[in-house]
Curated annotation (Swiss-Prot):
It comes from Panicum mosaic virus (strain United States/Kansas 109S). One of its GO terms (biological process) is transport of virus in host, cell to cell. Cell-to-cell movement. The chain crosses the membrane at residues 13-35. One of its GO terms (cellular component) is membrane. It is found in: Membrane. Keywords: Membrane, Transmembrane, Transmembrane helix, Transport, Viral movement protein. This is Putative movement protein p6.6.
Length: 59
């Protein structure tokens, strides 16, 4: 019975704590690479595509 009472309060906190730790790790890694895994590559591809279209129009 005692072990059950000890585990009950901890259970709800473990999930959110793990999620927060994973998010912090992701942020640290993205900063160390100077690249946000999803946002930056998609932004660059769109930017280069627009540049390429503008160059074709100017020619």
């Amino acid at each position: 019975m005692a072990t059950g009472k000890c585990y009950c309060p901890e259970d709800p906190r473990v999930g959110p704590l793990l999620v927060l730790c994973l998010l912090l790790l992701l942020i640290l890694f993205s900063r160390s690479w100077n690249v946000a895994p999803v946002v930056v590559p998609s932004y660059h591809t769109v930017y280069h595509h627009e540049k390429y279209q503008n160059i074709e129009i100017q020619k």
